[in-house]
């Protein structure tokens, strides 16, 4: 399913899952931005196998089984996402790009990666073992 998404859609998904666990926030963002292939993105982000649901007391926010406020009729449902599984799927899609960037750094080919030059490159090479692959995330926000 992820292979059918554009790089922009994958970046949107990565941003959403790395900044919020709120299903409502994700839905509002997708509705507002009119993401291409929106149904596929929503299916990926909100698929039940990734989610964990917990019912808690609406007043004290404790599990209903240990609620002490006595108001068990007031309950709400919390929905959490399994970020590890989402991130692994996205990294699998970007694997070739990551490997190519690392290769271009070692061969000193032109690269847009800030870690491919100067002191940043030297620090990275000093700390990274030969069989390791690091992924450096750089995010910017426009105000």
From Swiss-Prot:
Its recorded name reads Uncharacterized protein C13B9.1
Species in which this protein is naturally found: Caenorhabditis elegans
**Highest taxon listed in the record's lineage:** Eukaryota
